[in-house]
Amino acid sequence: MADPVPGLECRAIERLQPSLTAEVADVKWRIARCLYDLTVPHSGKRTACDCGLVKDLVPLLADDHHLVKTHAASVLMSIAVITEGKYALLNEEGLDKLVSLLADTTPAVRLNAVKALTLLAEAPSGKEKLMKSLNEVTELEGDSDDVIAKAAATAKKTITWLP
């Protein structure tokens, strides 16, 4: 991955954001892939929140193309590392869309969704909502992909953890 800082300095997130509404799936997933790289540093996550990127990414979770869903979920996962990102995703009703992706046929979609949900479970309101979807997360612990099964176990521990 190239250094994202020069891209952030020239406002790449804001410049790429409008392209997320393109009609061509190849454009959307490639833009989302670039946005993931830009949201790795903390400053990129903050910029994404400040410009309302979550609002444009959540609808992509329902896209027909698996790469669009995969990369949209990865960007949301990256943004949800920070508290502001968690609440932006919760406010845009992203939690329910991510839960629905736990049953997706594409392993990368399931993995990114469960990792994003794990981060949302760190917020009290996210944890509360995820308790209602614990069965879906528990089912994923039996996934044939060991990485996904392990991520689901981590999500379940995070959701059910009590202080």
PLM features: what roles do these ranges have?
Residues M1-P163:
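Long amphipathic alpha-helical tracts in eukaryotic proteins
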